[in-house]
A protein has these predicted regions:
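Cap/insert and terminal regions of metallo-dependent hydrolase folds
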Residues: 73, 79-84, 90-193
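Binuclear metal-dependent hydrolase catalytic cores
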Residues: 1-84, 90, 173-204
Length: 204
């Protein structure tokens, strides 16, 4: 609730300007408010339903992004199709359980070998604060090897990598840092996500 209220407050003026500029017919005011859905994630590896409407079911399960607490992933079900969002996390048994046979698994990915190399360079150059951050972030994200193994064991039909670290600066880096190492472990359809990407899953 706190986060949603913060976003609403931050965008309140922006929304009023858009409505004033385009008119209520184009920008209906009732579309503006975001309503938080409060829930307590299960303490174990189970999932709970947090949304159910018009055939869409959204479930949530606990993941591990300590010290961020709670941290969750999501399983979205519609017309027999399943999309799973890993959330920010290391690999957990709950992820495996709720990603099984997903039509699409969207999972964060970090190439810790490359991040570690960047950390070392920063330390050698005397950038201790930056080096410390690069060291710290490795303990609460999934390495590319974890992601590939998870998707393969879960039998996910498609895997889309997101929240990439380090951010690739070219298609070659995207392949070298992410696609290639994940593909060594995952045999399904693999996508390296980018802003604006749309993935269509046909339903019956």
């Amino acid at each position: 609730t706190q986060i949603v209220e913060g976003f609403r407050s931050a965008y309140e003026l922006e929304e009023s300007y858009r409505i004033a500029h385009h008119g209520e017919e184009i920008m209906p005011p009732e579309w503006s408010p975001s309503e938080p859905i409060e829930f307590v994630p299960p303490a174990d590896d189970s999932a709970i339903v947090i949304y159910e409407k018009d055939g869409v079911t959204v479930k949530t399960f606990r993941v591990n992004h300590a010290p961020v607490e709670p941290s969750v992933g999501y399983r979205i079900e519609y017309a027999g199709k399943v999309v799973v969002l890993s959330g920010d996390t290391i690999r957990t048994t709950s992820q495996l359980e709720h990603s099984r046979n997903a039509d699409l698994l969207v999972a964060e990915a970090m190439n810790k070998e490359v991040v570690g190399a960047i950390e070392d360079i920063n330390r050698e150059l005397g950038y201790e604060d930056q080096a410390t951050i690069l060291f710290d972030i490795q303990d609460y994200h999934m390495d590319v090897s974890d992601v590939g193994a998870l998707a393969e064991e879960a039998n996910a039909k498609q895997l889309a990598l997101n929240h990439l670290a380090p951010k690739p600066q070219s298609g070659r880096q995207a392949n070298l840092f992410f696609r290639d190492p994940v593909a060594e472990l995952y045999s399904g359809q693999l996508l390296v996500g980018k802003d604006g990407m749309q993935i269509v899953i046909p339903v019956p």
